[in-house]
């Protein structure tokens, strides 16, 4: 009877799903209540895309466009983008006004600089969009085989595909649209899919078509094929799909198991047939391609405020001048005669009419706005964009951040945040795969209450060092360092214990439990074996490194998983009775997948004896409560071992199983099928509810312990970042004991730190939590508040010495701490500690903590992670850094900057961050300095001429100042300048605090640069005016006019701003010499060439240099005297600052030049908490 029923059951589950639960059958009554309603209204006419019903649906075509512009929209849309910037819009208004009689200069000279800047930016946008267009053309013109009718398949371009088309996709081809899988080259319609382009995961996914479409394996089979698919509307969820297929009058449920997404690739399968259900913009990959969160750096936001301040100043000066002009114009008419007779207006002009002084003042206000526009640096935005792009290239090309082993360089995915890298105050880091390698090694296990495995972990080594002892590796007598440094012979397996290796487990007291333990490891997984055709060796494609480590461990200990079909798993193992190796076949009935909410996975299998087994593995927090009363025999010993493993920094899982009777399984099958057939958005919740009822009453087998080793250089990197004054938070899903010990191993925690631990894991609290009553929840919250308050009291009692404290909090406590009424006090405590570790954190909690730190502390936050569960945290932080590690590329694709190893963060921040912050800060300050120096000389000259709105300079002098004579040096400053070299940045991390405290872009520093510009303009104007106004300019006795005074002042301005650039630059390259001195040379060449043009073109600059300025000694003497006088205040200020108020970089520069840096003891940098890091020159300290 058992045999008959077993056969019946085998036939029934012949095509059950591997990655989902048991396949649904048409014999069950499905719930189609949602189909046809909002969100579930799509109807696909399979193999009938030309039918009137299909065409009436008006589904979009399959052309995918990633460009920002089209040919028709490029000009208006790009112009709109440019003139959204207030500065550009202001210059546009000024350009329009320059065509009116109000303009103090010609319209062409006003339009040319704006046109140059706008065209340069549009050119950059156009080139970038053209590259995207070329990529679009390449993708849309790819070809795929499409059913044309009568069983014939022809090649067609992707862009021509329509909903309902039947496609044949062959091995290693990408899917051109979202398809429902019908059949494949395998008899059971299985295919393997690589989804790296979607979620970054490199492991293969297994998909399978419905049983009813298995026979469609030949092209001719589609000649008469017709079906209807009703499914959900287009959406961005990659991991869900709800629909039904109506075929021959029967309805069959569709799930993600049948969905093949555009952008994924067919692997290890000769071909598949599928029907198009979503095209072009409706495909899930395009639905997911939304713009990432817009992030702007702190400096960029502050720069906008400076622009508004400059506008206020421009309007104030224009208003001030207009009022005075109106008063002087009104008072100009005395006794019927105009005092300034030469300004007498004609009948058509009121600009200087004393009888209409108010109107003249209003017109003058508009004229003054145009004249004062030179205070605003027109090329600021485009120059910064150019600089940031080139800075990003330098980051990408840094050989010191290139990970040769994986061939992965650093990649700045956006250039908007370069300077933000130099201002990070808090780093929030994931642990697994970020601080650690995410390359798991099976190192210990507990079976039947007995601990196995004699290896020594990195955490144990760190504990030894803290205790000052020398632990010896028990397995071979080597020292701890040797044990950790030794590479395992088999990747993923670092287990040493002769009691169960080499088949010795059969002699152990609990050999039967050991056998079940490793059988579970060999069977309970979703791993795909791959056989090398040349060597015959088996490798494993696993969804996670843990899974691979378990399968490898089972193989190395005698239980080799070697073959998987859709419905079976084959294992070679040692028979406990005969002692011989045998092959055992397990029929896979169901796979209950792992999820972060369940924290476990199970498989239901049938062994060769006909037994139904549920094999389960999961976190201890959920597994122990699911044990039956009779299955807790080894619970106490296993709990103790799990705690010991956690103390050693190991990741643990509990293994358990149970036998199912046939009736129970039949009930489960019926209920799970009903849940699967529920075509609604909450289908997954219904499935979880059913699986919850069968994953219970388990029998404990033991626990696994795998080690995730720290990446190279992590402790040194963290120590260096801490010396730079950066606080580091670790947000991990690990147990508290594991997280604490990893913290010690990576130098996040130190022996002299006092740990403030907040948790809700005590037995009393757990008992209270189980009651679930409102009073109990309130008590839990009150307990967390009490622990936080107590921690703050400890911190206060220590005098606020953050260096002495570390905060460790578990996930349950964190949930309460992040509530609105408690997060403020929690943040105060956390900020007061040097290090923070959040354990058992969910992805949502990681994002919420990041948001709390970013908004609550006011500091720049950087989040770093490597997995999909870190995406929210990366997007929430000011800067998201993705680690291109083992868990795929999803974190990288959501990040702002990608690096291959955590240790590269040290160079990214302390070198590139520091340099970029200094460069951008100095660049912006210098921009405003040079424009104020130039613009204020115009204002002073206008005031000198009774606000007559006459510019001191020729029109083209005005136009070319910002975009030609002074732009290249400041761009080179932003690209090449270094206050100290990279080795010194790393040697003296205190330099980084200049960015964290924003010393170089504070309002004090900005206003001081502006004041310096005003002073320079005043000195230039008055010295030039005084030197030239009351004496003959040359030997012919000619006095200086506007052309000579303007030319002389302009020369002085060019020299002064160029020399100021020389004094601002800390690190000269040949390029900088060329552009700085070349700017001065080009000014003189321009004077000669432009002045030599016909007078109708050169106007008042005609021959001014060759005939007036160059032959006159007074011009050269005045220029020399004025330039030196203008630079003298800056020399004096710099000398005083260097001598009495040196900044950190100045001190390092001084020591470098004095050759004192050869001795590392000259500087002492200690790890700091919340206080500012201090730089101590030991050589300058008096000896005691």
Curated annotation (Swiss-Prot):
GO CC terms: membrane
Binding site for Mg(2+): 866, 870
UniProt cross-references to Pfam families, sorted A to Z: Cation_ATPase (PF13246), PhoLip_ATPase_C (PF16212), PhoLip_ATPase_N (PF16209)
Gene3D superfamilies on file: Calcium-transporting ATPase, cytoplasmic domain N (3.40.1110.10), Calcium-transporting ATPase, cytoplasmic transduction domain A (2.70.150.10), HAD superfamily/HAD-like (3.40.50.1000)
Keyword Lipoprotein carried by entry: no
Record field: catalytic activity: ATP + H2O + phospholipidSide 1 = ADP + phosphate + phospholipidSide 2
InterPro entries for the chain: ATPase_P-typ_cyto_dom_N, ATPase_P-typ_P_site, ATPase_P-typ_TM_dom_sf, ATPase_P-typ_transduc_dom_A_sf, HAD-like_sf, HAD_sf, P-type_ATPase_IV, P-type_ATPase_N
Enzyme nomenclature, EC number: 7.6.2.1
GO biological process: phospholipid transport
Recorded topology in the membrane: Multi-pass membrane protein
Predominant subcellular localization, coarse grouping: membrane
Transmembrane segments: 76-97, 102-124, 307-328, 365-382, 922-941, 956-975, 1006-1028, 1042-1064, 1071-1091, 1109-1133
Segments on the Extracellular side according to the record's topology features: 98-101, 329-364, 942-955, 1029-1041, 1092-1108
Superkingdom in the source lineage: Eukaryota
Topological domains annotated Cytoplasmic: 1-75, 125-306, 383-921, 976-1005, 1065-1070, 1134-1184
Subcellular location: Membrane
Keywords, comma-separated and alphabetical: ATP-binding, Magnesium, Membrane, Metal-binding, Nucleotide-binding, Translocase, Transmembrane, Transmembrane helix
Gene Ontology MF term list: ATP binding; ATP hydrolysis activity; ATPase-coupled intramembrane lipid transporter activity; magnesium ion binding
Active site: 430
Function as written in the Swiss-Prot or TrEMBL entry: Involved in transport of phospholipids.
Family indicated by similarity: Belongs to the cation transport ATPase (P-type) (TC 3.A.3) family. Type IV subfamily.
Name listed for the protein in its UniProt record: Probable phospholipid-transporting ATPase 12
Organism in which the protein naturally occurs: Arabidopsis thaliana
């Amino acid at each position: 009877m058992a045999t008959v029923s077993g056969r019946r059951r085998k036939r029934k589950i012949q095509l059950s799903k591997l990655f989902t639960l048991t396949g649904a059958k048409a014999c069950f009554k499905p719930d189609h209540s949602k189909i046809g309603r909002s969100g579930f209204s799509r109807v696909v006419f399979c193999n009938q895309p030309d039918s009137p019903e299909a065409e009436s649906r008006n589904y979009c075509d399959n052309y995918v466009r990633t460009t920002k512009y089209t040919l028709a929209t490029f000009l208006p849309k790009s112009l709109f983008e440019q003139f959204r910037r207030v500065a550009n819009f202001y210059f546009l208004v000024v350009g329009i006004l320059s065509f009116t009689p109000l303009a103090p200069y010609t319209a062409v000279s006003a339009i040319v600089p704006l046109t140059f800047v706008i065209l340069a930016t549009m050119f950059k946008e156009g080139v970038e969009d053209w590259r995207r267009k070329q990529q679009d053309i390449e993708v849309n013109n790819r070809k795929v085989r499409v059913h044309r009718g009568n069983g014939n398949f022809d090649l067609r371009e992707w862009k021509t595909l329509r909903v309902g088309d039947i496609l044949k996709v062959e091995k290693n081809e990408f899917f051109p649209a979202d398809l429902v899988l019908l059949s494949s080259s395998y008899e059971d319609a299985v295919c393997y899919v690589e989804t790296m382009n979607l979620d970054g995961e490199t492991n293969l996914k297994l998909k399978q078509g419905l049983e009813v479409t298995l026979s469609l394996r030949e092209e001719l089979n589609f000649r008469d094929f017709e079906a209807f698919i009703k499914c959900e509307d287009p959406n961005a969820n990659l991991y869900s799909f709800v629909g039904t297929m109506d075929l021959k009058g029967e309805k069959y449920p569709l799930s993600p198991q049948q969905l093949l997404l555009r952008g994924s690739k067919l692997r290890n399968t000769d071909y598949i047939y599928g029907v198009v259900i979503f095209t072009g913009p409706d495909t899930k990959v395009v639905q997911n391609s939304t713009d990432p969160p817009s992030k702007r750096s702190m400096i960029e936001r502050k720069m906008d405020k400076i622009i508004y301040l400059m506008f206020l100043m421009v309007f104030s000066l224009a208003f001030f001048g207009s009022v005075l002009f109106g008063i002087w114009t009104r008072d100009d008419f005395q006794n019927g005669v105009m005092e300034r007779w030469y300004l007498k207006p004609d009948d058509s002009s009121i600009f200087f009419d004393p009888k209409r002084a108010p109107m003249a003042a209003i017109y003058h206000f508009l004229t003054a706005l145009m004249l004062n526009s030179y205070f605003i640096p027109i090329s600021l935005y485009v120059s910064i964009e150019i600089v940031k792009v080139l800075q990003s290239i330098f980051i990408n090309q840094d050989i010191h951040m290139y990970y040769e082993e994986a061939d992965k360089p650093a990649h700045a995915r956006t250039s908007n945040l370069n300077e933000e890298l130099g201002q990070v105050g808090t780093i929030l880091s994931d642990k697994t795969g970020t601080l650690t390698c995410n390359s798991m090694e099976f190192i210990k296990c507990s079976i039947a209450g007995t601990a196995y495995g004699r290896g020594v972990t990195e955490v144990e080594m760190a504990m030894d060092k803290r205790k000052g002892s020398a632990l010896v590796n028990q397995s071979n007598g080597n020292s701890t360092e040797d044990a950790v440094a030794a590479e395992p012979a088999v990747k993923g397996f670092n287990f040493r214990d002769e009691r169960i290796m080499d088949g010795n487990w059969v002699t152990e007291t609990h050999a039967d439990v050991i056998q079940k333990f490793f059988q579970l490891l060999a069977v309970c997984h979703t791993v795909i074996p791959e056989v090398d055709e040349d060597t015959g060796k088996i490798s494993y494609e696993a969804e996670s490194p843990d899974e691979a480590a378990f399968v490898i461990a089972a193989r190395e200990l005698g239980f080799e998983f070697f073959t998987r079909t859709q419905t079976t798993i084959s294992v070679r193992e040692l028979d406990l009775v005969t002692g011989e190796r045998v092959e055992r076949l397990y029929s896979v009935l169901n796979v209950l997948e792992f999820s972060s909410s369940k924290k476990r996975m199970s498989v239901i299998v049938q062994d060769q004896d006909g037994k139904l087994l549920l094999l389960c593995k999961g976190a201890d927090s959920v597994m122990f409560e699911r044990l039956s009363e009779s299955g807790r025999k080894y619970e106490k010993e296993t709990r103790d071992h799990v705690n010991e493993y956690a103390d050693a920094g190991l990741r643990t899982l509990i293994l358990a199983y149970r036998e199912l009777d046939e009736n129970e399984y039949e009930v489960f099958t019926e209920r799970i099928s009903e849940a699967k057939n529920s075509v609604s958005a909450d289908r997954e919740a219904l499935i979880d509810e059913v699986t919850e009822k069968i994953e219970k009453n388990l029998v404990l087998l033991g626990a696994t312990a795998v080690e995730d080793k720290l990446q190279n250089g992590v402790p040194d990197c963290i120590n260096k970042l801490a010396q730079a004054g950066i606080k580091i938070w670790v947000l991990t899903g690990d147990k508290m004991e594991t997280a604490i010990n990893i913290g010690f191993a990576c130098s996040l925690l130190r022996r002299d730190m006092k740990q403030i631990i907040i948790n809700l894991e005590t037995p009393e609290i757990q008992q209270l939590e189980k009651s679930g009553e409102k009073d109990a929840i309130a008590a839990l919250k009150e307990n967390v508040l009490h622990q936080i308050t107590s921690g703050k009291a400890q911190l206060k009692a220590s005098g606020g010495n953050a260096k002495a404290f570390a905060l460790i909090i578990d996930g349950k406590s964190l949930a309460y701490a992040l509530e609105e009424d408690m997060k403020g006090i929690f943040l105060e405590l956390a900020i007061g500690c040097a290090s923070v570790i959040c354990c058992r954190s969910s992805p949502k909690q990681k994002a919420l903590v990041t948001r709390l730190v970013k908004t609550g502390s006011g500091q720049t936050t950087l989040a770093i992670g490597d997995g999909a569960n870190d995406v929210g945290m990366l997007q929430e932080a000011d800067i998201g850094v993705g680690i291109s590690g083992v868990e795929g590329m999803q974190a990288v694709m959501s990040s702002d900057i990608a690096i291959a190893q955590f240790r590269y963060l040290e160079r990214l921040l302390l070198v590139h961050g520091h340099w970029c912050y200094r460069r951008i800060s100095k660049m912006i300050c210098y921009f405003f300095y040079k424009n104020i120096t130039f613009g204020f000389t115009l204002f002073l000259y206008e005031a000198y001429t009774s606000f007559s709105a006459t510019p001191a300079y020729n029109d083209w002098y005005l136009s070319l100042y910002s975009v030609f004579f002074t732009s290249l040096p400041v761009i080179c400053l932003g690209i090449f300048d270094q206050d100290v070299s990279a080795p010194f940045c790393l040697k003296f991390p205190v330099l980084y605090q200049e960015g964290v405290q924003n010393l170089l872009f504070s309002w004090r520093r900005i206003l001081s640069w502006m004041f310096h510009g005003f002073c320079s303009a005043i000195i230039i104007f008055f010295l030039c005016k005084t030197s030239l106004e009351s004496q003959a300019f040359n030997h012919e006795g000619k006095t200086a006019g506007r052309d000579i005074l303007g030319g002389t002042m302009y020369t002085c301005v060019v020299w002064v701003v160029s020399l100021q650039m020389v004094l601002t630059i800390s690190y000269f390259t040949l390029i900088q010499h060329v552009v700085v001195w070349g700017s001065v040379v080009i000014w003189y060449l321009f004077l000669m060439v432009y002045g030599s043009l016909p007078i109708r073109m050169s106007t008042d600059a005609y021959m001014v240099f060759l005939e007036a300025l160059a032959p006159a000694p007074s011009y050269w003497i005045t220029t020399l005297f004025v330039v030196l006088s203008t630079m003298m205040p800056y020399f004096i200020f710099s000398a005083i600052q260097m001598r009495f108020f040196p900044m950190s970089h100045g001190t390092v520069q001084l020591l470098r030049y004095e050759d004192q840096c050869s001795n590392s003891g000259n500087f002492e940098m200690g790890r700091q908490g919340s206080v500012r890091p201090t730089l101590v020159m030991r050589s300058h300290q008096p000896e005691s």
